[in-house]
Amino acid sequence: MLICIPDILDKAEVADFRRVMDAAEWEDGRSTAGAQSAMVKRNEQLPPDSDVARALGQRVLSALTRSPLFISAAIPLHIFPPLFNRYASSNGHHFGVHVDNAVRGDRLTGLRIRTDLSVTLFLSEPEDYDGGVLTVEDYYGSHEVKLPAGHLVLYPASSLHLVTPVTRGTRVASFFWLQSMVRDAHARSMIFDLDTAVQALVERLGRDDPETVKLTGIYHNLIRYWADV
């Protein structure tokens, strides 16, 4: 299940992120890559333990809590501290096909998570750079993603994916992983579809409609059945 979620950050927030990031020191992006990924990763990132990365990461986490769609789709248990990368055309930056590590550990907090879902939050407008397309492969084919600044994409971390070479301008983004309460991707997708249908019924019939109440109960019982907390 690949889901694009709009307006996690508004334009003013994006501009402030970019102002802070443009003034920061960057390092080789391979410092956080696994063995296979490091062979195909060519980009830069903010040092993960830097004050700048940690402060911006906290702002991303706060923004996520304001998005009911993100919570519904991800059902997050643990979210890895957000990281930040930069692909510059002047350096021929790209990221070849790879799959993310199954487990990620944070050196500073000691947090270890199973990476159920990968997230990219775009911080550059699509017209500001050429290339830099996130391409994700899943059961249904290949999906190309290039979203407006402030929007994010959520997709299974088990997916093969790549970022095409940036040939003009600079692509800046936040990226991170999360462990969902619901491990199984198919179960999580069904729960999301059910929640979407329930919310539509609430809008039409009201929250106290008997059938809406019954379906809401089914939603929570499925969470109870599948969730690991």
UniProtKB/Swiss-Prot annotation:
GO biological-process terms attached to the record: DNA damage response; intracellular iron ion homeostasis
Cofactors: Fe(2+); L-ascorbate
Cofactor: record remark: Binds 1 Fe(2+) ion per subunit.
UniProt: Fe cation binding residues: 98, 100, 161
GO molecular function (one): 2-oxoglutarate-dependent dioxygenase activity
Enzyme's top EC category: oxidoreductase
Signal peptide range: none
Gene3D superfamilies on file: q2cbj1_9rhob like domain, Rabenosyn, Rab binding domain
Alphabetical list of InterPro entries matching this protein: Oxoglu/Fe-dep_dioxygenase_dom (IPR005123), PKHD_C (IPR041097), PKHD_hydroxylase (IPR023550), Pro_4_hyd_alph (IPR006620), Pro_4_hyd_alph_FE2OG_OXY (IPR044862)
Keywords carried by this UniProt record: Dioxygenase, Iron, Metal-binding, Oxidoreductase, Vitamin C
Transmembrane segments: none
Chain residues that bind 2-oxoglutarate: 171
Domain Fe2OG dioxygenase: 78-180
E.C. number: 1.14.11.-
A UniProt-annotated Pfam family: 2OG-FeII_Oxy_3
Keyword flag Transmembrane: no
Descriptive protein name: PKHD-type hydroxylase OCAR_6723/OCA5_c13470
Organism: Afipia carboxidovorans (strain ATCC 49405 / DSM 1227 / KCTC 32145 / OM5) (Oligotropha carboxidovorans)
